[in-house]
């Protein structure tokens, strides 16, 4: 089974979900809705977009049902991690149960909420 990949140019969580639902097959929609409810808080999404401001292009991959990887590039096309953003998110109570890590131009968001 190949990895799911989509590039997004969106302004809000509603848009990201709508774009993903258009890109992926119908059988993936329940997983995407779980991602929306459990993981894509405004705080997480806003912080990722802040990092990707120059292009607003996010490449999303879903290596597992509990993990989403967002890759982004700056205006020169270079990978651009922002560790201070990850630290801010880690301390945000709204992201409890969600870990966010920025590395090598990617933002990995992992859900750690069993049974939710």
For the regions a protein language model found, what residue spans apply to each?
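Conserved ATP-binding N-box helix of the HATPase_c
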Residues: 31-57
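A short, compositionally biased N-terminal segment around positions ~18-40 that is enriched
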Residues: 22-39, 77
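Helix-loop-beta hinge of the Bergerat
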Residues: 2-30
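Generic alpha-helical secondary structure
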Residues: 13-17, 34-41, 82-84
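Conserved beta-strand-loop-beta-strand hairpin that lines the nucleotide-binding pocket
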Residues: 1-3, 47-116
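Residue-level signal for functionally critical sites in structured catalytic/ligand-binding pockets
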Residues: 17, 30, 35-36, 107, ...
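Short acidic/polar alpha-helix capping motifs at helix-coil junctions
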Residues: 8-10, 21-23, 34, 89, ...
